[in-house]
């Protein structure tokens, strides 16, 4: 995200990402208008002739009006009990790039492994509003061409000094095998958008690597993780019994899956 700060006849350009901010030297936009002009030109002329402006995410797009009508009919047919306002469906739904690569069996084998597209239904289920953070957003999605199941998609900016989520799912898989994962979502795939094979990427932070000391530990990469099934917020349960059963399942997932695999969950 870019911000232009104007202070009398002087200006500075600020470039924010999920790890920090890069600030230009102050320049006089009256006597040296070429700096501001070049910035604005480059802003709307990204490299590689990609659409949009510099920093825009080309892996997430708005559906067309025809796609909205088609996907609305598909979602209503496959998930008639799903409650979502028609206006929010039309306004907030998105197409997003994901990766389908389940670790274990019991999944839809008709979905080709690798990068694919999913349809995010309506507004996010949960969203972090902090700028300098993982900025986690959780969507409810269906896989394009395989809309009979709902999945949870977590979009976040992971610190590169930390292990990816698939590491922990693989560890649980090693200890649990093909047995039932009680109280724990199943890993369906992960897409590291910041893995540019050594090339600069708009899905990697830049400010952290410019710091001295341990600044590189704050470097982040844009990751999307797909899991199944989709959970419910505690506030949406219709009875105390239903809520208690949900809490019990979460505790079982912690004890039988994480602790038995020698994994300690940080928030706990």
Q: PLM ranges: what are they?
A:
Residues 237-268:
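Conserved kinase catalytic-core helix
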Residues 1-222, 226-229, 233-238, 245:
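Intrinsically disordered, low-complexity terminal regions enriched in charged/polar residues
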